[in-house]
Design a protein with these regions (language model features):
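Structural signature of outer-membrane beta-barrel domains
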Residues: 1, 40-46, 94-98, 125-131, ...
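Face-selective signature of the C-terminal outer-membrane beta-barrel domain
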Residues: 1-99, 113, 172-175, 234-236
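Hydrophobic, lipid-facing positions within transmembrane beta-strands of outer-membrane proteins
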Residues: 15-21, 69-75, 91, 104-108, ...
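Residue-level signature of outer-membrane beta-barrel architecture
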Residues: 21-25, 79, 102, 110-113, ...
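Membrane-embedded beta-strand positions of outer-membrane beta-barrel proteins
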Residues: 35-37, 89, 108, 122, ...
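Surface-exposed extracellular loop regions of Gram-negative outer-membrane beta-barrel proteins
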Residues: 45-52, 97, 117-160, 180-206
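Gram-negative outer-membrane beta-barrel transporters
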Residues: 180-182, 203-268
Length: 268
């Protein structure tokens, strides 16, 4: 009789040490500036193994032991253009020492106080993220001990958002925020539907390339009543469409694409 073997053996230990510093200065009633940096030291020890089929021996899919760093810095200014117009603009950058990848991300927002009760705002920004550490240390049969994903670039996204806020009363606010997000340089498996945007397993076992895309379109609506006479509540709803393009060039629904979400909160 065949002896049973485990289907997977996932050993993963991670420790992050974070150093953050910020500097704020108010130059005038209409001009303030904020700058800062964050240094994140990441220590990892991973050995992820799976069996392709039942009763087969485990095969290593990701293995790494060491440390790396993510360094980020930003500078942001808020300028009161007039009594009704406010401009927020800045730049953010980050650098991953693991593979010497870096990104520069401009961000800006413009707010208009149309009336004492109504505000409109428009915001745009570029954002990026690194992947989970196990992704960078994937090993395949054809490459032996070589980490096939170590040179993956950041996943990047462009965010555009409109905002309308209305003060219904001293204790109640309404906010409506339509938005769109365009993602690019998303790690995907070549000629496959797989994308890290749709990751569901505890591990990744294939070589990836930064050729995927994603798109999120939606609108968030929030009604909030502030605490008064011991009662507080908030009702929020979202309508959205979330899709990604795999390495095969085909667009799919993400696993998060439920199209709507409704939440309620009440407290006394």
């Amino acid at each position: 009789a065949l002896e049973s073997t485990p289907y997977m053996d996932l050993e993963s230990r991670h420790t992050n040490l974070i150093l953050t510093s910020t500097f704020n200065r108010k130059f005038s009633n209409r001009f303030t500036n904020k700058a800062g940096f964050t240094y994140t030291a990441m220590f990892y020890d991973m050995n992820l193994a799976i069996a392709p089929y039942e009763a087969q021996l485990l095969e290593t899919v990701s293995k790494g032991d060491g440390n790396t760093s993510l360094i980020s810095a930003y500078n942001s200014s808020s300028v009161g253009l007039s009594d009704r117009w406010t401009l927020n603009a800045g730049i953010y950058g980050q650098y991953l020492t693991l593979n010497n990848k870096w990104s520069v991300e401009p961000r800006a927002g413009l707010k208009w106080q149309a009336t004492p009760k109504a505000t409109f705002a428009l915001a745009y920004g570029i954002y990026s993220r690194m992947e989970k550490m196990d992704v960078y240390f994937v090993k395949t049969k054809s490459t032996g001990n070589q980490s096939v994903n170590k040179n993956l670039d950041f996943t990047k996204a462009q965010h555009i958002m409109l905002s309308f806020g209305y003060k219904i009363s001293d204790r109640m606010n309404l906010k409506i925020e339509p938005y769109v997000q365009f993602l690019h340089d998303v790690p995907v498996m070549a000629d496959s539907s797989y994308s890290v945007l749709n990751r569901s397993d505890f591990y990744v076992e294939d070589a990836l390339v930064n050729k995927g895309r994603g798109r999120n379109i939606g609108i968030d609506i929030t009604l909030e009543r502030f605490l008064e006479k011991g009662l507080y509540y908030m009702i929020s709803g979202s309508l959205f469409d979330s899709r990604y393009r795999g390495g095969d060039g085909v667009w799919y629904n993400t696993k998060f694409n439920r199209n709507y979400v409704i939440n309620g909160l009440i407290g006394k």
